[in-house]
Each structure stands twice: as C-alpha cells, then as structure tokens.
C-alpha cells in the first residue's frame, strides 16, 4: 500500500525556464559593481552562466552537487575579487531572487496537494543549489504544510 508521495520541485510543482541569461539581474550586477566589478550586466551574467555550465558538466560526471557559494567563489576569483570580501549568502539570495522571478506554480497545484495530503504523506526533493530559494518559493506559492 502506498503511504507517501515524493515530488520534485522544478518541472513538477512549478513551471520555470532553466536558462540563466534570458532575464535581467540589475541588483546582482549592482552588488558586484559595489565590489569593483566593471563589467556590464550582460557580460557579467554570461560569465556567471559559463561557470554554472562548467559546474553542471562536472556534476554529471562526479554526481556531486554544488552550491551558489561554490559558483560565486569561482566567479569572484575570475573577476579578481576576493570572495572573502563579499557576503556570498546575500549575493546568492539576490541572484536567485532575480533568476526565480518568473517561476510560477503549475495550475491548481495547491488544491492537488491539499487533496493528496488527506491520504498520503507528501515529501519534496530538489537538487537546488540554494535551499533558501526553495523555502521562499514554497511560501510564496502557499505550498508549505
């Protein structure tokens, strides 16, 4: 007898665009400009995307996930900014807020989960690179229980 159901967050509970260069990141750009980065926003975002792509390819081979702190440590080193001088947690919050701005819950997902919760234990899995983003989105979409 089935007692529980697991859901993957991205692509199952929400609709999202996994690309990282299709929208603007003005606050992320400003935070890095405040630390002396003199790239325009698009060049900066392309640089972040290149680091992400490299980490994703490495993760496919190693089966080890990475964090936003890992990404921004490499990005900052590439930009010759000491990562120890930057609040990586705040930078990750800023970047993931901008990246996730267009994420939407699938239609009627709240109702579906409430109905399923009456009979099953529900669980969530995700391989996110920044757990606070998932917590924030669950709250925003009223998917917490």
Name these PLM-found stretches.
Residues 1-2, 119:
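A short, charged/proline- and glycine-enriched loop
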Residues 2, 143-145:
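Local beta-strand N-terminus motif with an aromatic residue
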Residues 2-105, 131:
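N-terminal helical cap/lid subdomain that shapes the substrate entry/recognition surface
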Residues 36, 80, 119-120, 142:
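Glycine-centered loop/turn motif at secondary-structure junctions
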Residues 88-105, 109-141:
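Substrate-recognition element of Asp-dependent hydrolases with the DxDx(T/V) motif
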């Amino acid at each position: 007898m089935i007692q529980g159901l697991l859901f993957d967050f991205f692509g199952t509970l929400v609709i999202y665009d996994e690309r990282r260069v299709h929208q603007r990141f003005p606050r992320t750009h400003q935070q890095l400009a405040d630390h002396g980065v003199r790239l325009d926003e698009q060049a900066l975002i392309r640089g972040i995307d290149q680091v992400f792509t490299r980490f994703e390819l490495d993760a496919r081979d190693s089966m080890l996930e990475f964090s936003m702190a890992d990404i921004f440590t490499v990005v900052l080193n590439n930009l010759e900014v000491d990562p120890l001088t930057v609040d990586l947690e705040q930078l990750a919050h800023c970047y993931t807020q901008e990246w996730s701005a267009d994420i939407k819950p699938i239609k009627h997902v709240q109702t579906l989960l409430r109905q399923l919760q009456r009979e099953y234990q529900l669980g969530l899995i995700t391989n996110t690179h920044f757990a606070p983003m998932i917590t924030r989105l669950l709250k925003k979409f009223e998917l917490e229980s």
